[in-house]
Amino acid sequence: MKANNFKVAGWVATAAVVAFVAEIILTFMSQVPAYSEVASPRLVSLALAIHIALASYAMHRLRGFLNERFEFHRADVLIPLLVGGGIALGLAVISSRFYFEPAISAILMIMIGVPLGVVSVLFGYRLLAVNGAISGYKKPFAYIHMLAPICFLSVIFAPLGLLLLLAGQILLALMFFTDESPELEFV
């Protein structure tokens, strides 16, 4: 039996979940006048930067996980695009808090978010082809990657998109902690 080489990635993904929850709470606190001094834009941006760094590493390790455990290479190009797009979107959000007008921020988010959403949907679709259930986490993780961008594009369902992203981060951490080997396929 092979040792699980992805436990560190699982812990990093777990830390990304904690940072994501902290970021969401701080963002909401910054909108309430009584707490706006506690949750300053710098603190919210720091939480976002930590979350993005941790989540980016976890997604990067997902590529190795899929390659090593399942010999799955159909997402090798999409995962770096997701990581790069997530970093670009995070930097855009951080810089929009300090430097940009709301209209310019919205245009920037759309310019980065729409292509990132398309890549995410394609990634979710391709992930369904993995030979194995990844302890039952494959389908929910794939469907989250297909549904979350649609929620964000609808704007009305953006809070649901946030919850889906959080659930996706949790599933990613759980996938790294599994010791499942790929199912044998007889032809």
Indicate where each model-derived feature is located.
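Hydrophobic, aromatic-enriched alpha-helical segments typical of multi-pass transmembrane helices
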Residues: 1-187
